[in-house]
Amino acid sequence: DILNDLDVMQEKKVVQKFLHELVKDKGLASYGEREVRTNLIMGAVDTLLLSEDLTSMRKVFKCPSCGSEEEITVKSQSEADKLEKPCSNCGETLKEESSQTLIEDFVEKAEEMNSAVELISTETEEGMQLLRAFGGVAAILRYHVG
């Protein structure tokens, strides 16, 4: 299928561009959930690369006593169910308020910041490398972040 081949070529190209930036001295590359999220919020991300095989969830927990909120990433719903996290303000156990996949969370933030999003399959060597070596979350930056 020609369209599928074009998608695969585009995916390989964008992952290779990320890897090229990664090895440069002041390269425009960022990876890992926390670092990419920070760069995304700053508006520094040009292209966000996300593995289609990301299964983590982004949850918002709220304190029933003081109303304080915390965002937490969990690997699975069962991990979230077991979470007994105390509120950093008053010590009360936080309750789950809302939930979405990590992919949905990142795509929303990318759209807010006018960053391009590339969902990368694990059908290619580059796609597997993105998932295994970089946790499935990477970015090509608009400018160098010091």
Regions found by a protein language model. Name each.
Residues 1-146:
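Terminal alpha-helical anchor/extension segments at protein ends
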